[in-house]
Amino acid sequence: MAGHSKWANIQHRKGRQDAKRGKEFTKAAKEIIIAAKNGGDPSGNPRLRAAIAAAKSINLPKDKIEAAIRKGTGQDSGGDITEIMYEGYGPGGVAVLIEVATDNRNRSVADLRHIMSKNGGSMGESGSVSWMFERKGVFVFEKTAYSEEELMEAALAAGADDLHDEGDTWEIHTSMSDFNTVREAFESDKLIMQSAELAMIPQNMISVDIETAKKVVKLLEALEDYDDVQQVYSNVDIPDEIMNEL
């Protein structure tokens, strides 16, 4: 597994998606606020364009999108949000990256340190694990909607890197610089994407046993449940036979 959808699949199987809908709206709005700091016109701001597309994919209302843009550009208050990437280790020595959007850096780092230590993890210095990951564009498609051949052809034509079988879904990766070009090519081809985002992809995975897997999942869930966290990435590789028992 490529490592991106594996964690999403665990969440789906554990029935966490519906419970997270409210937080997904908050995360999407924060990403728009941060992106809009570099300009409120999506045509000239690729990150904002991607953030709006992601927000629309989860049905964030148009007025919420527009309000977030105004906050990011400084037209309205509420845009004082800082983006930070924290690093650390989880049970079994797995690497953990925590993407945070916060209006209070001191509060966030103190809370994250508590969550990590409470769940068998520890915070690391800047650069301690980030070198194990690469930021890439990630496009996810329903397995039942497209064949491997169809998506491989579309990926090559769009200039994407590779295609991964992630169980219930197909996952296409591309370089960060090509993300918007590839997304626009897929949209032009009328391909329906389950999601399209920039994500930190682990270069190598660490396999764990079932007891460690339970601890890692508990930590990752606790981190994702924290309000200031936008995304959590890990290089944990949980075999399917163990994942089925979680």
Curated annotation (Swiss-Prot):
Disordered: annotated segments: 1-23
Pfam families: TACO1_YebC_N, Transcrip_reg
Family membership noted in the UniProt record: Belongs to the TACO1 family.
Record key words, sorted: Cytoplasm, DNA-binding, Transcription, Transcription regulation
Protein name per its UniProtKB record: Probable transcriptional regulatory protein LI0269
Compartment(s) of residence: Cytoplasm
MF terms in GO: DNA binding
Keyword field contains Transcription: yes
Extent of the signal sequence: none
Record-level GO BP terms: regulation of DNA-templated transcription
Lipoprotein as UniProt keyword: no
Gene Ontology CC terms, in alphabetical order: cytosol
InterPro entries, per the entry: Integrase-like_N, TACO1_YebC-like_2nd/3rd_dom, TACO1_YebC_N, Transcrip_reg_TACO1-like, Transcrip_reg_TACO1-like_dom3, YebC-like
